[in-house]
Amino acid sequence: MSFSGVKVSPECLEAFQELKLGKSLRYVVFKMNDTKTEIVVEKKSTDKDFDTFLGDLPEKDCRYAIYDFEFNLGEGVRNKIIFISWSPDVAPIKSKMVYSSSKDTLRRAFTGIGTDIQATDFSEVAYETVLEKVTRK
């Protein structure tokens, strides 16, 4: 449980394991339930198109997401699981506060994340920006 009292639903952990071990999912988007007491799965997808994933992040509200990021730098195809904390500048203040104070609870539940990204704008989660972050040494 987080400082905010928010819990992580068991389906979040199941979805993470499905993405990490099953390799059937490409990404999962998480949100707060309506009462802001639990983090739940909003969407699971097998779509490999990064722009489709970005389209599932709302322009005006917060979300968390995990993405199995695939890239090739000439050494063969590699994958890294990234955790994204999405908090757009135009999101409601209360939403930003709850998501911010609950992020670590969800993040700690996931072992095997390669890169964490905190984003307030789509430019911070653009493919090239993410590629740069996951390939930093």
UniProtKB/Swiss-Prot annotation:
GO biological process, one term: mitotic actomyosin contractile ring assembly
SUPFAM superfamilies attached to this UniProt entry: Actin depolymerizing proteins
Domain ADF-H span(s) in chain numbering: 5-135
Highest taxon of source: Eukaryota
Subcellular localization: Cytoplasm; Cytoplasm, Cytoskeleton; Nucleus matrix
Pfam families xrefs: Cofilin_ADF
SMART domains: ADF
CC annotations in GO: actin cortical patch; actin cytoskeleton; cell division site; cell tip; cytoplasm; medial cortex; mitotic actomyosin contractile ring; nuclear matrix
Keywords: Actin-binding, Cell cycle, Cell division, Cytoplasm, Cytoskeleton, Nucleus
Keyword Cell cycle: yes
One annotated GO molecular function: actin monomer binding
Keyword Protein transport attributed: no
Family: Belongs to the actin-binding proteins ADF family.
Database matches in PANTHER family: COFILIN-RELATED
Known role: Controls reversibly actin polymerization and depolymerization in a pH-sensitive manner. It has the ability to bind G- and F-actin in a 1:1 ratio of cofilin to actin. Binding to F-actin is regulated by tropomyosin. It is the major component of intranuclear and cytoplasmic actin rods. Required for accumulation of actin at the cell division site via depolymerizing actin at the cell ends. In association with myosin II has a role in the assembly of the contractile ring via severing actin filaments. Involved in the maintenance of the contractile ring once formed.
The protein's name: Cofilin
Organism the protein comes from: Schizosaccharomyces pombe (strain 972 / ATCC 24843)
